[in-house]
Amino acid sequence: MGNPRLSLEWEDEAYVLSARSHGETGAIVELLTEARGKVAAHVAGAASRRMKPFLQPGARVIVRYRAKVEGQLGSATLEPMGEGPSSLFDDRLALAGLSAAAAVAAAALPEREAHPGAFHALEALIRVLEIPEIWPAVYVRYEAGLLQELGFGLDLSKCAATGAFDDLVYVSPRTGRAVSREAGKPYHDKLLPLPPFMLSSQGGLAEGDVKAGLDITGHFLEQFVFGPLNRPLPPARLWLLDRLAEADKL
């Protein structure tokens, strides 16, 4: 069938990242697929009551896409898969997490470039959004995964200064590499605190851990992804931090 990214007609599963009105009844919808990456398409009838529920960020859909010319905006029809984010409608905090995840992916990922790791990271986050005790930490790992997928992965395997593997408690804001307690002590005020959950999935979360993790991923998203594009972090990402603070989840 050839390269799926170059095909002018295809069918695939996708997550909705965003939808904005276009014309009287249509919308331009950004979708994240596993094989084709982020794809935008015009969806007719998107304003209808039937379609609105599965045009929300994080909804999983079957996409049937067609384009006349490679590189130009194509059209698509969408069919829902499962309940989608409607199951979270009573959980405003989880919805804020889902909206932030979709907004960051929509703003960070390039068009028509396969990033299967980003697709699976979003999938993993959505699966745990109904578990309030753990999803904020998974969200941090999601953003770290996006950085990795885009070529800006954090190196938390050992101390950048000494090569030590133990007692890693900082991250260099310049390089994204871990720093041990001993090596980082003289530069404590200039380093980013590294929460233990970013090193291991074992153990619980302490107060301040999620905030520290979001500070790390937010810093490097700004430095490596959005800064070069002269863009700030998406508003939905900033709102998530506010909502988590209000819920005492940081």
From Swiss-Prot:
Alphabetized SUPFAM superfamilies for the sequence: ArfGap/RecO-like zinc finger, Nucleic acid-binding proteins
Recorded superkingdom: Bacteria
Manganese listed as a keyword: no
Signal peptide region: none
Pfam families given in the database record: RecO_C, RecO_N
GO biological process: DNA recombination; double-strand break repair
Function recorded in the entry: Involved in DNA repair and RecF pathway recombination.
NCBIfam families named in the record: reco
Name of the protein this chain belongs to: DNA repair protein RecO
Gene encoding the protein: recO
